Amino acid sequence: MPDAEQNDDRVLAARIAAQFQEGGSRLMCEFDLTIVDAEPGFVRFTLPVVPRLCHGGGVLSGQAILACMDTGMVFVMMSIDETSNATFTTVHLQTAFERGVPEHCGEVTFEARAMKTGWSLVFGQIDLLLPDGRRAASATTTYMWL
């Protein structure tokens, strides 16, 4: 990727992070999500796996995973709409859990992407990846522009 495109992607990632810190869910801001890559329609971010997000079985809770997947699509929507600050909402989020995320794995990566962008709806896919690259969960989602 040429340097100008890499710089544009870094600027987009920083803009999304700043906007989310300013107007996003306070709860999700406490998750310490870090956007590591962004381009229009795609955002990759990490989540530190810490004890407060895990349940007694020693794995990351499904509630935390779902919240991150929904937030990942928020990031994607922000990457698509760079100028108008349009509002949007979740219409549908369906998740499949494939394997547990061990409490002591460090951090995990989420990759969220728009699969089809329309005038009123955006269809998305979000994957949760373990540090070794194996997928732990995936979701499909539909968002609506308001």
Segments predicted by a language model, with ranges:
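Terminal targeting signals and extreme-terminal segments of soluble enzymes
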Residues: 1-146
